[in-house]
Regions:
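A short acidic, leucine-rich amphipathic alpha-helix
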Residues: 39, 112-121, 139, 192-196, ...
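Short capping segments at the starts of secondary-structure elements
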Residues: 14-16, 104-112, 187-190
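Single conserved hydrophobic/aromatic residue that forms the stacking wall/gate
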Residues: 1-8, 13
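Non-catalytic regulatory appendages
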Residues: 212, 216-267
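Glycine-rich, small/acidic residue-mixed loop/short-helix segments
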Residues: 265, 271-332
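A contiguous, low-structure linker/loop signature
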Residues: 40-99
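A short, conserved structural fragment
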Residues: 43-50, 141-150, 214-220, 292-293
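Short helix-coil junctions and helix-kink-helix linkers
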Residues: 20-30, 117-129, 196-203
Length: 332
């Protein structure tokens, strides 16, 4: 069974969809791609734009209150970008696109972006890549569409209200508290700045969210910053598994504004680029030490790796165990 109590972020790049599934699967007791694909296909996990906004995986029961927290901020950012580039879309055009989406997706249909574009063109709407991206992004943050059933490797859209059963509406304070709890339960120790970066919340709202769950948090001063630890987090005990293959855009890196505790700044470029592309990395005893990728040979699935930390020597047995876990995930 898969239960998401948080969201994960990812970007839409070539081969990223397998990495997205691995990000969930590697955290399961029995990793298997079929279980993750089933959850995505059935709508237990949704892949949509929310928070910062980039692509995220969201538990279905969390989607509405998360959209309520971030929708206006995302719309303002998108509108500001469009205005600055002379590419504004009118509210009438957005309304028209929403009407068409309601008609063509009604009846629990799932359609790809290209299929939707063909319907838009027939309805007199502009359907080039720019307009489609804006139309679909607005429909997502308005809570009209979300990810649909899996069509092979192609992302699809479906009507949110047909895909996700009704859920109790939360107040803004309840939503802020729930988001803060989810973050610090899974990312602690972390700072206010980390939480603000991850959530997309302004510092004032991020600070309010932390104050709402203050009884659940411990705070420690270290390196001139306040670090928060959720009371559900283990602070002692033996960690299992010294080496992990982290997918691109994994929460271990992207979930924090400051990553220097696990990755020296001089190695940043080996893990991610200045324009926000994150690579698959090797995690050894809590530190990022190298890269890995799928095998270069077509029929080979055993991953390849390279180290950029020259002071680290990894045992072959340890590497093989980590790689075999990934291979088992792909084949189960």
């Amino acid at each position: 069974e898969i239960r998401l109590s948080l969201v994960g972020s990812e970007m839409c790049i070539r081969d990223s969809y397998t990495m997205v599934k691995w990000a969930v699967g590697m955290r399961l007791k029995s990793p298997g791609i079929q279980a993750v694909e089933k959850a995505l296909h059935q709508g237990e996990i949704l892949r949509t734009h929310v928070m910062r906004p980039t692509w995220h995986l969201v538990a279905a029961e969390d989607i509405r209150w998360m959209l309520k927290l971030s929708a206006q901020r995302i719309k303002s950012a998108n509108d500001s970008y469009a205005k600055g580039h002379g590419l504004e879309i009118t509210e009438q055009q957005y309304d028209r696109s929403h009407t068409v989406l309601g008609n063509i997706l009604s009846g629990k249909r799932s359609l790809t972006k290209q299929e939707i574009a063909e319907h838009f063109e027939r309805s007199g709407l502009l359907a080039d890549n720019y307009h489609m991206t804006r139309f679909m992004s607005r429909a997502e943050v308005e809570g009209i569409v979300c990810s649909g059933e899996c069509h092979g490797r192609q992302h699809t859209y479906a009507l949110l209200d047909e895909r996700v059963p009704p859920t109790p509406e939360l107040t803004k304070e309840e939503a802020l508290a729930r988001l803060a709890t989810a973050y610090f339960r899974s990312h602690a120790p972390a700072t206010l700045q980390d939480f603000s970066w991850w959530s997309g919340l302004p510092l004032t709202e991020a600070r309010q969210a932390i104050s709402l769950i203050e009884p659940e948090l411990m705070s420690e001063q270290w390196n001139s910053q306040t670090w928060y630890i959720h009371d559900s987090c283990r602070t002692s005990g033996k960690a299992t598994g010294n080496l992990h293959l982290l997918p691109s855009y994994d929460e271990y890196l992207i979930g924090y504004k400051d990553r220097t505790d696990v990755l020296p700044k001089e190695d940043y470029s080996k893990a991610f680029t200045n324009n926000g592309l994150f690579f698959p990395v090797l995690l050894y005893k809590g530190h990022v030490v190298g890269n890995w990728n799928k095998a270069s040979k077509k029929k080979e699935i055993f991953p390849e790796h390279s180290l950029f930390r020259k002071d680290i020597c990894l045992k072959e047995e340890l590497l093989n165990q980590a790689k075999e876990k990934y291979v088992r995930f792909l084949t189960h």
